[in-house]
Amino acid sequence: MEINLNGRTALITGGSLGLGFAMAKALSEAGSNVIIVARNEKNLEAAHQELEAKKSGDIFSYRCDVQDANEIDNLFNHISKDIGPVDILINNAGRSAAKPFNLISDEEWRDDIDLKLMAAIRLSRLVWEDMKQKKWGRIINLLNVYAKAPGAETAPTSVTRAAGMALTKVLSAEGASHNILVNAMLIGFIESDQIKRRYEASGSNDSLETFIREAGSHLPMGRMGTAEECANLALFLASDNASYITGCAINMDGGLSKVP
């Protein structure tokens, strides 16, 4: 199946590492202009250079802390001036945060909500009118499998991601008549920078490869997924091949979830 995104412009938050970078690479290779956004300038520059070397569409990068509403506004002022309307928005920024409920402070709740929910709300609002006018738009929200089936000690992530799933349904309902298609990808255990951070925090004496292999062996498919596999799904959802798919929350977890 050939996917052609020539002439489209995609904005990907958390685009310098892991899933975000893999999605940026896939969309760029399909012809899309790609804007990557991240907080860490060093990682952002490295990602930009790597994407430039293999690009099909144009590559842009902006440092932005999407937890900050003012920085988001400044980001969009630059994008509007330098590039123009965004056709594809991938809300990918986020990091795993989970601990016993009674140990989560108000500040930790606010930080998680700002990063994982409010950033998606603000960015979606900023791209919405241009998508309506063009009668074409794609918004993809990267969530977590706990959005559907939260367990003990999965907050605050499970709570904010569940809210992100509700946001996906609201936006898909409002966008359908304007051909703005909004879907969510619920991510399970994927080989990524977050898994690397979990490995480093574990104090394991095993190699990273052994850690990943051992953790993946307990999953239904016997392995973790890859960032490239996630990127393939995002690429499909961003394309005209997914022209009748909206309002879906798709598990990307190798069969881990008990809730479809």
Residue ranges and their predicted role:
Residues 9, 16-18:
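Conserved glycine-rich cofactor-binding loop
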Residues 4, 149, 235, 246-260:
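Short C-terminal tail/terminal secondary-structure segment
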Residues 104, 150-158, 170, 198:
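Active-site loop-to-helix junction immediately N-terminal to the catalytic Tyr of the SDR YXXXK motif
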Residues 100-101, 108-113, 211, 215:
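Substrate-binding pocket helix/loop in short-chain dehydrogenase/reductase
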Residues 124, 160-161, 168:
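Active-site helix of classical SDR
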